Amino acid sequence: MPISVDKAVIARLKTHGETFEILVDPYLARDFKEGKDVPIEEILATPYVFKDAHKGDKASEHEMEKIFGTSDPYEVAKIILRKGEVQLTAEQRRQMLEDKKRYIATVIHRHAVDPRTGYPHPVDRILRAMEEAGVHIDIFKDAEAQVPQVIKAIRPILPLKLEVKVIAVKIPGDYVGRAYGEVRKFGNIKREEWGSDGSWMFVIEIPGGVEEEFYEKLNALTKGEAITKLLERKGL
């Protein structure tokens, strides 16, 4: 269900000496600008393109055709979102920025370790390092695409090593049903085989920072009966 007009914000594009505006859901508009597959119909509060949204002054089909090469308001809206700016409130911008920072810090926590200890840095410590380094985060850019630049910026403050771990696991047959789907969420199964007793044996590659979480999940799923062996640590 589209956002109501009173909760929508304006997305604005100035081009060819003209201004074009649409009313959008700020969070879905952000997702769209990040490259996520969000139907334009769900983003728009109303299926119109305006010259001035506050006055309700709509753009004519002739104007849209002349400048955008189409009079379809949905196609024009996509162009406005891609090339224009979303007019967020200060609180919306602050919340989106905090959410994106924490997401980026969580990605780093999962994929990087402290080379001195082999363990991941806590998310809050990574966030503090980002603050100390004065890292710029773009709220309209995909979070994972910003991770490399963030790692580069905080490395002088926080030693980091990108790493994956390769682990051999054997799960008794009694627990395979409940463990199978959960285990696959952690990483990439490199190879697997089944024992005559129904046990599941596999080698999995996981992000370096989730090793302890992986072991804890295995123990919970198998009541401590899973057998594991760390085969390899691979730097990225």
Swiss-Prot record:
Name of the protein in question: Ribosome maturation protein SDO1 homolog
Complex and partners: Crystallized in association with 70S ribosomes.
InterPro entries named in the record: EFG_III/V, Ribosome_mat_SBDS_CS, Ribosome_mat_SBDS_N_sf, Sdo1/SBDS, Sdo1/SBDS-like, SDO1/SBDS_C, SDO1/SBDS_central, Sdo1/SBDS_central_sf
Domain of life: Archaea
Organism: Thermococcus kodakarensis (strain ATCC BAA-918 / JCM 12380 / KOD1) (Pyrococcus kodakaraensis (strain KOD1))
GO biological process, one term: cytosolic ribosome assembly
Family: Belongs to the SDO1/SBDS family.
Pfam families on file: SBDS_C, SBDS_domain_II, SBDS_N
Alphabetical list of PROSITE patterns matching this protein: UPF0023
